Curated annotation (Swiss-Prot):
It comes from the Viruses. This is Uncharacterized protein L872. Keywords: Virion. Its main location: virion. GO terms for cellular component: virion component. It comes from Acanthamoeba polyphaga mimivirus (APMV). It is found in: Virion.
Length: 340
């Protein structure tokens, strides 16, 4: 998507890293045509280009099919969890592809980036409208401090732009698209709608997908809030912290519904549930984005999996159930937003 290309160009200009250069290079591969403009709703040709681009971004395949549920509140670390999920898939399910190729085997159904790339009738994309909104509300002072001072206005105005153009049906279409093409699926959720999640898991399990839940966990909402402000200044969408639908509330909902999603997933013959402390240092973050997972074990909170194997017609269930020693303490939430 053009939005992603522009995002990585901006990142490499502000923080040069080889990982961003590698991502940009994928968009200039002559075998992957770049869609001019964004996805135009109710336009068949535009939809076909969008689906072709989604397919081209997932050039590899795995021996099994996986539904990776990236679980947790906004700004908790679901982007980096895609890499972590790919690592565990290789480790546990004995995939022969490299971790990087496993990562490239996924169709991404994340609704935010789909929405950002929607092209309006005026020719502007939603990401452009959101960035114009920042200019209108903050002027030249685009500091974190000024964004926090104006968070109520930024959150409400950006939400109005986002919600009126959010095409959830396009995200759902990608599930069936992935099934048809035998591709793996990334699904993002805060866990606010467990019945919907259960329906999707049941559907994809019927088609042979192994459910994997990755829950990047942070117990301090002020960390999420600061992350969301930083992301908002780049992408244009802002979230309040202390309102009924704010970050603190979503953080509580995710944690409260976590046992429910675990119960659903653990019914299947193969699954993985992995919860970890996602408050990584910059160095650890850089390593993971470079497919170096050597420090990951230090951040594990909960690890549950079942892998069914058949040897000489005998079915064996290999079960792992590990919880960190300070698990209960680690889950104590600090809901002080620190907005002022």
């Amino acid at each position: 998507m053009e939005y992603k290309l522009n995002k990585y160009i901006h990142k490499i200009n502000t923080d040069p890293k080889s990982i961003y250069l590698n991502k940009i290079a994928k968009y200039y591969d002559s075998s992957i045509p770049i869609q001019v403009g964004g996805l135009r709703l109710n336009d068949f040709d535009s939809l076909v280009k969008f689906l072709k681009q989604a397919y081209d971004k997932a050039p590899t395949e795995t021996s099994n099919k996986y539904l990776v549920i990236l679980y947790g509140p906004p700004a908790s670390g679901k982007s980096i969890s895609r890499y972590i999920a790919s690592y565990w898939i290789q480790e546990l399910f004995k995939e022969t592809e490299s971790i990087e190729n496993i990562y490239k085997s996924f169709i991404d159904t994340g609704i935010d980036e789909i929405t950002y790339d929607i092209e309006t009738p005026t020719g502007k994309r939603i990401i452009d409208l959101l960035k114009e909104n920042i200019d209108n509300k903050l002027g030249n002072d685009k500091s974190i401090e000024n964004a926090k001072k104006n968070i109520s206005l930024l959150a409400s105005s950006s939400w109005d732009i986002y919600r009126t153009n959010r095409p959830d049906y396009v995200s759902e279409l990608l599930y069936y698209f992935a099934i048809f093409l035998n591709k793996n699926i990334f699904l993002e959720t805060t866990g606010s709608s467990i019945p919907y999640l259960e329906r999707i898991i049941n559907l994809l399990s019927f088609y042979g997908y192994i459910p994997i839940v990755v829950y990047p966990f942070i117990n301090d909402v002020s960390i999420l809030y600061n992350r969301s402000i930083q992301r908002g200044l780049k992408e244009g969408r802002f979230l309040r912290c202390d309102t009924s639908f704010g970050l603190a509330s979503q953080m509580q909902i995710s944690l409260a519904n976590y046992p429910k999603i675990k119960n659903i997933v653990s019914q299947y013959k193969n699954y993985l549930i992995y919860q970890y402390n996602s408050n990584f240092s910059n160095e650890i973050t850089k390593n993971i984005y470079s497919f170096n997972f050597s420090s990951l074990g230090d951040y594990m909170l909960e690890f549950k999996c079942k892998i069914e194997t058949i040897d000489d017609k005998i079915t064996q269930n290999n079960i792992i159930d590990i919880t960190s020693n300070n698990y209960d303490k680690a889950l104590n939430l600090n809901l002080n937003c620190g907005e002022n």
